Amino acid sequence: MTEQLKQKLNDSAVLRWSVLALVAFTMLCGYFLTDVMSPLKPMLEKELLWDSLDYGFFTSAYGWFNVFLLMLIFGGIILDKMGVRFTGMGACLLMVFGCGLKYYAITTTFPEGAMLFGFKMQVTLAALGYAIFGVGVEIAGITVSKIIVKWFKGKEMALAMGLEMATARIGTTLAMVLTVPVAAFTAAMRIKMF
């Protein structure tokens, strides 16, 4: 009966394209958060006293767990064993947790000279958050591909995958275009309020 119900859900064009919009928006947010720090490098150097080594350490963190701990392979195994709902929710939770840790690290003032693994504590915690976020967003990408394959068949599948990726990359564009003006605006608002 569930197979028959699933078949009927897949037949609904409105539902099919709504699912695509939902997963594409999720990936748009993921790509936005992946690239949001790039335009802020000068601000990080000026306000948080990061240098190029700190920034390079931070940005390299995105691939740490995916490459060295083979998390993408484990993510694929989990996706095959547990399904798209479990894996998708888990990936989103990893993204939120990693992003929260990165935000905490960047907005918290740590004691001067506090070091962790030879780097400033702030940089290390931000990098750890970014590494966790990276696992979540990459596993979400695998999950989105499987969702598209489940919902779309034939000639629509390639179009759906292309639309999802194009929508996700809009997140990168938004990060490059909006980040500095928003940061400058919020900094100006903080100055006016205090």
Question: What are these language model-derived features?
Answer:
Residues S18-S52:
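Extracytoplasmic
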Residues M27, T59, G63, C92, ...:
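Small-residue-rich transmembrane alpha-helices and their cytosolic helix-loop interfaces
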Residues Y31, D35, G118, Q122, ...:
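Small-residue-rich segments within alpha-helical transmembrane domains of MFS-like 12-TM solute carriers
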Residues S60-I77:
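Central cavity-lining transmembrane alpha-helices of secondary-active solute carriers
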Residues L93-G118:
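C-terminal ends and interior cores of transmembrane alpha-helices
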Residues V123, G129-A166:
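Cytoplasmic helix-loop-helix junction between adjacent transmembrane helices
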Residues E164-F194:
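Helix-loop-helix hairpin linking two adjacent transmembrane segments in secondary transporters
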